[in-house]
Amino acid sequence: MLIGEDFTKIRIDLNGLVILEPNAVISDFIMALASFYIAKKLYSTRRSSGFLKYWYYFFLTFAFGSILGSMGHGLFHYFGPQGKFPTWISAILSTYFIEKAMIKSYEQYNKNNILGKIAFFKMITVFLLVITVISSPAFDKNHTIGFLPIAINTLIGVFISVSVISAANIKTQVGFKWLLIGVFVM
């Protein structure tokens, strides 16, 4: 699938209830269950470090976003692209939380929380960019452009923050190699 490309949607009609993209509904629901499970596992340890706290926030936000995404995909026939807005918001927040988690693991080199400030500024900028895009006449013609800033933000947030900081942290904590491998697998 190409980012920004709109394909014909698979449609299921259940006694008058139209469900679109059932494959996305199922995969989003599975991601939500897995994320809720991981968030539950992190819940008791979330106060032990900023790193774990922000991973907990990431999985919790990602889980809620996946549930909303499941509904946004499935009920697209009724809500249109506006039904995906809550998921887009959660994607921006999830990316911010994953960046903050990685920044917290690198705190000894993060003087004056400059990386945290950059992540926050980037999050606000992406929110404003998405609002600008979805308010434009171009969005009315092609609603998929609204997701483009979110996709770019996620790529930057995950690939740069997780891979770069994991690579730097491998020297002191071997477990970061799994995060680095995970980024390359994606």
Language-model-detected regions and their locations in the chain:
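Hydrophobic transmembrane alpha-helical segments in integral membrane proteins
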Residues: 4-32, 143-150
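Juxtamembrane loop-transmembrane helix junctions in multi-pass integral membrane proteins
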Residues: 8, 12-22, 46-53, 78-85, ...
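Physicochemical signature of membrane-embedded alpha-helices that form the seven-helix bundle of GPCRs
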Residues: 20-30, 57-61, 83-90, 149-152, ...
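Hydrophobic alpha-helical transmembrane segments of multi-pass membrane proteins
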Residues: 31, 54-75, 181-186
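Internal transmembrane alpha-helix with an interfacial aromatic "cap," most often the third helix
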Residues: 35-45, 70-82, 86-118
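Alpha-helical transmembrane segments in multipass membrane proteins, preferentially the mid-helix core
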Residues: 36-40, 100-104, 129-141, 153-185
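Membrane-interfacial loop-to-transmembrane alpha-helix junctions, especially the N-terminal start
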Residues: 46-62, 110-123, 171-182
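Membrane-interface helix caps and helix-loop-helix hairpins in membrane proteins
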Residues: 74-82, 133-148
